[in-house]
Regions:
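Flexible loop/turn connectors
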Residues: 249-359
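Short beta-strand elements in bilobed, periplasmic/extracellular small-molecule ligand-binding domains
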Residues: 93-104, 208-241
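Hydrophobic alpha-helical segments within soluble ligand-binding/sensing domains
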Residues: 163-189, 209, 241-251, 269, ...
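N-terminal helix-turn-helix/winged-helix DNA-binding helices
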Residues: 2-8, 47-81, 85, 96, ...
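Append "Primarily bacterial transcriptional regulators
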Residues: 12-13, 43, 287, 348
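Short coil turns linking two alpha-helices in DNA-binding domains
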Residues: 19-24, 36
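Flexible loop/hinge segments that line or gate small-molecule binding clefts
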Residues: 130-173, 193, 267, 293-305
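An alpha-beta-alpha
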Residues: 174-217, 336-353
Length: 359
């Protein structure tokens, strides 16, 4: 006779039509969470009927930690934009007695897949992506089991919650500003612009739309990027800074006729500024430079970078609040049948790195 299949909380959740997190919390007698007597009875009766063996006593503290743990998936931590997001997530999580665990993928699809396999078997409070997931279908599958929130430009086909920035609008806003200053030849400096990197694509598209709306020749926009192989070969923790530095040096060696450099984010823009300074150029006298994200370093007096603000700290807090509210509202609902979408409007922050083009 074959060995009988072990009944899990997932089996019970599917049997009665409740979320796995709800079933797990009831069976583990989770503190500080209340469920109706009807819901508790449904779960306990189903567990008994299916033959569920509660082994929570063997790892009670670790199970409790998992139920109250939010996993944050970041590409890397060298960009202070991600550090700010994580700080805001931790800040808000403490209010709801959540702990936060951060993992990095370096935007590697295989690494992301391995984490998916691990996370799909855990009873977590929720997952927050700080960048668009490489495999949308797998993130959608996770959302059927627990709250999943992405921060940033929302990818097509996603069926999970999001706290968004309209990247096209952000790119258009900056492009419009530079054009109004008189910059009609602009180089867009970016890490690889590929299908999955939608924030980079959207910001670049926004710049193009700004040119089109003002009747300017889009051929005067130069996209300066590198291959994925080149990007992955950069041996430094400050990878985005290095991208900005190397691509700007290439543009200068090629004799660019652009009067402004627009970087896909502030860390890349800092690399642009360093390259220009190393070659003896003055900013904004010789070249204007701008970025996106308004990280802390951008506001320092010696840098004073023109950029786009999009409420980074608030977005991290909102992501945690979405997870918390999902647990409150879905105690009697199967899975998570509704999707929340919040969008922040970009704001132009004008500082000292931009001005009228050189004569």
């Amino acid at each position: 006779m074959g060995k009988r299949k072990k009944i899990t909380t997932r089996d019970i959740a599917e049997y009665i039509g409740l979320s796995q997190s709800t079933v797990s919390m009831i069976l583990s007698h989770k503190e500080n969470v209340s469920f109706s007597k009807e819901t508790q009875d449904i779960v306990l009766q189903a567990a008994k009927k299916l033959g569920y063996k509660n082994e929570i006593h063997k790892s009670k503290s670790s199970q409790k930690d998992l139920h109250q743990t939010i996993v944050v998936i970041a590409p890397h931590l060298s960009n202070s934009y991600y550090a700010t997001l994580i700080h805001s997530i931790v800040y808000e999580a403490k209010k709801h007695n959540y702990s936060v665990f951060t993992i990095t993928t370096m935007r590697n699809a295989q690494q992301e897949d391995s984490y998916y396999e691990l996370l799909s078997n855990l009873d977590l409070a929720g997952i927050i992506y700080l960048y668009p997931p490489t495999k949308i279908s797998k993130a959608n599958a996770l959302f059927k089991r627990m709250p999943v929130v992405s921060i940033g430009d929302k990818p097509q086909g996603s069926r999970f919650d999001s706290v968004e920035l309209n990247g096209v609008r952000a790119g258009h806003l900056m492009g419009e500003y530079l054009l109004n200053l008189g910059h009609e030849k602009i180089t867009f400096i970016s890490a690889p612009v590929m299908g999955k990197e939608i924030s980079r694509i959207h910001r670049y598209e926004g710049l193009i739309h700004a040119f089109e709306d003002q009747g300017k020749d889009v051929q005067n926009i130069q996209l300066k990027t590198m291959s994925l192989a080149q990007y992955e070969s950069i041996q430094t923790e400050n990878i985005e800074y290095q991208v900005g530095y190397e691509l700007t040096m290439e543009a200068l060696e090629e004799g660019t006729d652009s009067t402004a450099f627009l970087a896909n984010n502030d860390m890349t823009a800092l690399g642009v500024l360093s390259a220009l300074k190393s070659e003896g150029y003055k900013v904004p006298k010789d070249f204007s430079v701008a970025g996106f994200d308004n990280i802390l370093m951008s506001s320092l007096p010696d840098i004073s970078l023109t950029t786009i603000e999009h409420a980074t700290f608030l977005k991290g807090k909102e992501a945690v609040d979405i997870i918390y509210k999902k647990h409150l509202k879905n105690n009697m609902q199967k899975s998570h049948p509704y999707i929340l979408r919040l969008e922040y409007e970009p704001e132009l922050i004008i500082r000292k790195t931009t001005g009228k083009p050189r004569k």
